[in-house]
Amino acid sequence: MNITQILSQELSATAAQITAAVELLDDGATVPFIARYRKEATGGLDDTQLRRLAERLQYLRELEERKAVVLKSIEEQGKLSDDLRAQIEAADNKTALEDLYLPYKPKRRTKAQIAREHGLQPLADVLLAEQSQDVEAAAQGYLNENVPDAKAALDGARAILMEQFAEDAELIGTLRDKLWNEAEIHAQVVGGKETEGEKFSDYFDHREPIRAMPSHRALAVLRGRNEGVLNIALKYQPDDTPITQQSEYEQIIARRFKVSDGHKWLRDTVRLTWRAKIFLSLELEALNRLKEAADTDAITVFARNLKDLLLAAPAGRLTTLGLDPGYRNGVKCAVVDDTGKLLDTVIVYLHQENNMLATLSRLIKQHGVKLIAIGNGTASRETDKIAGELVREMSKMGLHKIVVSEAGASIYSASELAAREFPDLDVSLRGAVSIARRLQDPLAELVKIDPKSIGVGQYQHDVNQSQLAKSLDAVVEDCVNAVGVDVNTASAPLLARISGLNQTLAQNIVAYRDENGAFDSRKKLLKVPRLGEKTFEQAAGFLRINGGKEPLDASAVHPEAYPVVAKMLAQQGISAAELIGNRERVKQIKASDFTDERFGLPTILDILSELEKPGRDPRGEFQTASFAEGIHEISDLQVGMILEGVVSNVANFGAFVDIGVHQDGLVHISALSNKFVQDPREVVKAGDVVKVKVLEVDAARKRIALTMRLDDEPGGAKHKMPSENRSRERTAGRKPQRNDRAPANSAMADAFAKLKR
């Protein structure tokens, strides 16, 4: 199959859809642009499908390039048969291709090559083909100045056969698949590391099938190995198997080369090939495969959580007081207006409560503050308590206080971007500005921070960093373009994420705006230096201009489709202002009346949807959690308490919930609902406000077990996974050990815990 056919099969799309999408991508179109404005061409492929297509397209093209290199190399050696060419051209992955290339791949002189140079290839061939003869006698005919005795001859012949066995592509493929499907990974504590590595205690003697090991356990075990606490190995047969007993893998090798059961020398050669050569290579390969799969899974989790946070509902354009709590260095305070512009800053101290109340009260009255955003770090609860007093005392002001995640705020405050924005503002106060702004509009503020610093990733520092960065960049790009931005108020970092734009163009837009005033039309963007027609095509639909000359500029209708809207207006006999936002009028328009060769039904329906509700925001309604009074630390928790919290992170095994005690609790997947849950994201997402019951508290190990099944009783049956969940574990091939899995809601191992960074 060619690349188009492969992608068509993998994405369940037609060849025409794939061809169109590939042509658009090759022409420089972005995924958001294609997904939104080229639905006719791609048959409606969404951004997720297009991202997958782009990723696989790159892989398959690299595979084709590698095939060409391999074919050329083997052909130059004069060893390229028609059968081998066909096998190489049929290889559908890089591993299979490299297996085929291995016997022909230039390599440093091996023992086998030296043996061939000494004339021992015929001996190896004879020993394998004529197994009835005596090996010692056969070796006598191959002695020379480089091969002084029979032992040297047989050692050379063995090296040749071992290399021959180990480079058989079909055999290696069979052994690889068998090992992956049947072997267990075994983790054991390194002697003397029990105390130092206590956080990995769940893995001090842990076994489970490698193919079924979930990403969080795989990454925990691999981290334990990297920190020198755990030894890990692959086990392919019971530990008590006699060392002389032939394994199933050795039997497969023997059958492949027709080695008879009674030929000890050849049997020993097979055993050595497997144990000293093939297994060691496949074990390393399997562990790498486990790591890659775990990385992919963890990155997917991170990306989903990031998307949920970026698309969290904004509190809106209200003057906001941001509080960055602290004890010794005080509570840093910053007031921003409804556009996010900094108005005032001050530092107050918790131990000077009266002064703090008076100062904050003055700020609130002076600037007409409507929202108080409180960072959720150190001293958050004490700061929240004082903010609560202000809300009560100033009830006529219509104040609201909200605790928000401050993850990444300190990194932003020390960044070059923050320094450019606030060159004269103390670094410590910049974080308070970020906290205030992220309440007003999470997306606009969080794009300024490295996604890895937002604190919603599972083992984000353990996974492939380039793959992680690529995935997260795609998420940010998709989120920003899904919402769209106001070109007259957006920051350069936000504009840089728009389809077709980059940092340079974003800065040029801001500079042009600062010098010439607000843009009054999308067309004016073409006056920005280096912003040409192609870039305009990619970006214009995602850039909004409110209150401009053209009402459609405030919508997601692309300028290329304005003539279509003009036809609609002419048919209805009304102006754009009369149609936009007028649901009844829009409903009177028949979409099929306006389709043509360029604009099909999907685009016309999108236009009508946008006209009905222009500039619609895909983000939900703003909501907040109310943390319980008097619950500030983990020591304040009692089993049985029912609390309100915010989902901070969703993993494959459950959801972490911030209940205001500086340590997130875990709702295991089995405690998310009374119904069977396949994926935690079916029930919750990052940012959701939920009610939970405390099931277990281990203050020493900082573990909090929670449940969303509020009728669960601590110590009762809920500490066992529901039978349906156990069934799922079995069907997935998992074999969790008792020392690996604590009761279903015991907050899991520290190694599973989200690291808030």
Swiss-Prot record:
InterPro entries: HHH_9, NA-bd_OB-fold, Ribos_protein_bS1-like, RNaseH-like_sf, RuvA_2-like, S1_domain, S1_Tex, Tex-like_central_region. Residues 640-709 form the S1 motif domain. The keyword Membrane does not apply. PROSITE patterns: S1 (PS50126). Signal peptide: none annotated. Residues 710-741 have a biased composition (Basic and acidic residues). One of its GO terms (cellular component) is cytosol. Gene3D superfamilies: Nucleic acid-binding proteins (2.40.50.140), RuvA domain 2-like (1.10.10.650), Tex N-terminal region-like (1.10.3500.10), Tex RuvX-like domain-like (1.10.150.310), YqgF/RNase H-like domain (3.30.420.140). Pfam families: HHH_3, HHH_9, S1, Tex_central_region, Tex_N, Tex_YqgF. Keywords: RNA-binding. Residues 710-757 are annotated as: Disordered. GO terms for biological process: nucleobase-containing compound metabolic process; translation. The keyword Metal-binding does not apply. One of its GO terms (molecular function) is structural constituent of ribosome. PANTHER family: 30S RIBOSOMAL PROTEIN S1, S1 RNA-BINDING DOMAIN-CONTAINING PROTEIN 1. This is Uncharacterized protein NMA0194. It comes from Neisseria meningitidis serogroup A / serotype 4A (strain DSM 15465 / Z2491).
